[in-house]
């Protein structure tokens, strides 16, 4: 899933996908890519492929706000993402998306309101991730110059906030991931202490039970 796995001519992509599917025991492929790296021909091929094996296309959308996408130099708009997701779903291909919570310039209210746009997309699955600013990157330099633009979450604080996201999220969208933690030596900001994913899930489940809330309980569809 790393990198943009539709960023080649279709003939070369076909050879790569078929090579992966020829490995014994492989029953499908998950293709991570950018929304500006697909077209009708590539999706038509993947639609045919999905008739004989499991195919998932997962788009790195990251934000629904064009100002944010420009600020982090994504090189595409949210409308581009919407078109890619819709073209994929129209072909009955399983489609997922990835979003980052806490991107520079986005308030918590912005993040909560973005769930409405996410709900409007024909997504099967979604992955969320709290912002982590890696050392030695342009974003680290921007953070040093403009720290007020950034929202970092402490672990317990993020669990509470993600409950709010989940309450507003369309109930049929499967959440495949809601957080992650790189080793502290690689990023700046709060460290969650290399907490295990299953521990995060347990914390979220407990908080949902304590608050007596669930995915979609505030969804207005």
Task: Describe the predicted segments one by one.
Residues 11-20, 47, 107-124, 181-204:
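Short, electropositive alpha-helical surface patch
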Residues 125, 132-221:
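Auxiliary Fe-S-binding modules of radical SAM enzymes
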């Amino acid at each position: 899933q790393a990198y943009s796995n539709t960023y080649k001519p279709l003939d070369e992509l076909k050879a790569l996908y078929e090579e992966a599917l020829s490995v014994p025991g492989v029953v499908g492929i998950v293709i991570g890519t950018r929304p500006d790296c697909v077209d009708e021909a590539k999706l038509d091929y993947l639609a045919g492929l999905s008739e004989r094996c499991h195919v998932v296309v997962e788009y790195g959308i990251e934000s629904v706000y064009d100002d944010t996408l420009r600020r982090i130099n994504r090189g595409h708009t949210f409308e581009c993402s919407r078109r890619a997701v819709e073209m994929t779903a129209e072909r009955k291909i399983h489609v997922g998306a990835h979003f980052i919570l806490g991107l520079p310039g986005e308030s918590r209210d912005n993040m909560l309101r973005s769930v409405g746009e996410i709900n409007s997309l024909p997504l099967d699955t979604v992955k969320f991730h709290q912002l982590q600013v890696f050392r030695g990157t342009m974003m680290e330099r921007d953070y040093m110059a403009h720290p007020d633009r950034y929202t970092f979450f402490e672990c317990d604080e993020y669990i509470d906030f993600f409950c709010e996201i989940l309450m507003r999220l369309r109930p049929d969208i499967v959440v495949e991931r809601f957080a992650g933690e790189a080793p502290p030596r690689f990023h700046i900001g709060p460290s969650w202490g290399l907490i295990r994913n299953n521990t995060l899930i347990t914390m979220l489940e407990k908080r949902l039970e304590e608050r007596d809330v669930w995915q979609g309980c505030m969804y207005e569809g």
